[in-house]
A protein has these predicted regions:
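Short strand-turn segments of transmembrane beta-barrel domains in outer membranes
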Residues: 2-31, 41-42, 47-54
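Transmembrane beta-barrel strands of outer-membrane/channel proteins
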Residues: 13-17, 40-44, 77-83, 123-129, ...
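C-terminal extensions
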Residues: 16, 70, 137, 143-177
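Residues on the lipid-exposed face of transmembrane beta-strands in outer-membrane beta-barrel proteins
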Residues: 27-31, 63-67, 110-114, 158-164
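Subset of outer-membrane beta-barrel
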Residues: 33, 43, 58-62, 66-68
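Flexible loop and strand-edge segments within Gram-negative outer membrane beta-barrel domains
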Residues: 47-54, 58, 68, 72-122, ...
Length: 177
């Protein structure tokens, strides 16, 4: 995502429509006022697919807030969420029934970054999570499954690195995760 360099507000909307009732939409708002900057994006995408039981639908959102502490240091936090529903009919010769997925994923992070003429780096905290509900479906002549794949996951961590250009054409980076 590009940061806005000059003070002001920019808002944009993208809409697309295609065959099989396919929609691709996105709305974005960017703000820069003094040392503060933000971006907020929301999207909705869907299609019926080119075959029965091949639908896909996705909702997404992203937010980033940032603040320049001084010319060389800034802090930021962001959040990215998406949820999608998908159906898979199998192949034409080997159809699958009720093969449906409902998946939600998210990510958030916080960063303290520095940028000088010959060195730059960051301290970052990140957290990712997801919730998955998947029906593997069943084939012709089979019984529907009496269970679902359900999963929840979480991952978090801290990353620190500093990079320096000691001479022209050189960059040395050290860090830990």
């Amino acid at each position: 995502t590009r940061r806005q360099r000059e003070d002001g507000v920019r808002t944009g909307v993208r809409l697309g429509y295609g065959s099989y009732d396919t929609w691709m939409t996105e709305a974005t708002n960017q703000v820069k006022k003094g040392r503060f900057n933000s971006i907020i994006t929301g999207s909705y995408n869907r299609t019926n697919g080119h075959r029965p039981d091949m639908e896909f639908e996705q909702y997404g959102g992203y937010t980033r807030l940032g603040y320049e502490l001084d010319h060389s240091w800034n802090v930021s936090a962001d959040l990215n969420l998406t949820h999608f529903n998908a159906s898979n009919p199998g192949t034409v010769s080997t159809p699958v029934f009720d093969n449906d997925s409902r998946i939600t994923r998210g990510m958030t992070s916080f960063a303290l970054e520095n940028r000088y003429e010959r060195t730059s780096g960051a301290l970052k905290f990140f957290y990712n999570w997801g919730k998955h509900h998947i029906n593997d479906g069943y084939g012709t002549g089979e019984e529907p499954l009496d269970y679902r794949f359900n999963s929840k996951d979480r991952m978090m961590g801290i990353s620190w690195y500093q990079s320096a250009s000691l001479f022209s054409g050189n960059r040395l980076t050290a860090g830990i995760d």
